[in-house]
């Protein structure tokens, strides 16, 4: 074989790997484009409305349980409660939605922990892509099923939402864990092995920002189409369910390209290889006759691996700082959206169409925030990643502060419908920037080879706060029957996060993560 032929073969292999790396990034964009409408449109707008609507239809007046909630008998100011478990307990109709959110996130956390260890153990990008598609199909079909329920099936509504949200949690963790792998694969292929570490930071930020913008773009398209669907069903009880149906179909269809796009750039070591199974087994000696781990051990590996990762995270100062800060931030930012929807419906009596318009405003400005904040504002003013996060939090804290003003003033402080439209713009900018920056920051400070497990920690921190936040707001609403009091809770949390974020040093965190990855036992590294 001639020297020229060998060069041609090497060039062909290099081009093949570059194409694979580029396709993986396109597949990552498809993940964001297909699934983002579920959380932005369904979870943030439609599901809260459906839960409150079903609760109101099946609820009664708080002061007289013999009077249906939607009855014209009694005062308009009478609050409503929903009887659960054969009327053993009664909860505020707004609180019911919040309690379901908490329960769904608890289920999501359990399934995320179980699955994240499996994908790290398997060590194949293609397998992770299949996980995205499998759970996406189940989540999409559960969303479609929600659109077919009648208003008496309140427990079925809660159950299907819990399943769909659990599936979204899995693909969110696995999808985010693929980002640093795709970035490094792309740089390795383009530079044929060697690349500058600083390029990882910039490329991660760019791809993360584009992914967030694409996700919000898809959510915007879904919301605009949903406006026409809801308008065509105006006056019907099924108007929101038509929008939910469209979200489910969108999720199902647009995730399919990932089947062909996401693949291994290099041939991975097979997960069922006896050496890999032996090296990675959390239970040495418990492989089957073929040297393979059984599914019981695969599932438990996620919990064992997570426990080990928390032990390692204690050695990573900046990972711990970020996770503590994120727990506080997420508790406020994620809960405030669903609370605002319930507040708008219950207190301001806004129509479904108006709430979708607010959601569209939020999505448009989230796209701007995801694109402008990391790529222009942070660059222009030379903010560090941690500084950028702090400025976003300060910006976002105005929203609950403005809601608090409603206790003291009658003219403003979320007393009128138009104020919700203005705050939607404000919230969207902060949400988009936070989504793009937080993902890229955390991906920079996790040990190479442990992306899925550490992003599982990130998700668990996020979801742990999302279990607590809605639950506490639900208790507060049950006690006061006034959801406005939740704004005190949100404002306090955002203020508490600032001094924690001020301690974050991304460069130090990245250095410590790389050092830790070098000293991890061979059995705990991903075998590339």
Curated annotation (Swiss-Prot):
CDD domains registered for this protein in UniProt: MFS_Atg22_like
Ranges in coiled-coil conformation: none
GO process terms (BP): amino acid transmembrane export from vacuole; autophagy
Alphabetical list of InterPro entries matching this protein: Atg22, Atg22-like, ATG22/LtaA_families, MFS_trans_sf
GO cellular component: vacuolar membrane
Vacuolar side stretches: 120-130, 175-210, 263-318, 374-388, 439-485
Compartments (UniProt record): Vacuole membrane
Family statement drawn from the similarity comment of this UniProt entry: Belongs to the ATG22 family.
Record function comment: Vacuolar effluxer which mediate the efflux of amino acids resulting from autophagic degradation. The release of autophagic amino acids allows the maintenance of protein synthesis and viability during nitrogen starvation.
Protein name: Autophagy-related protein 22
Organism (species): Saccharomyces cerevisiae (strain YJM789)
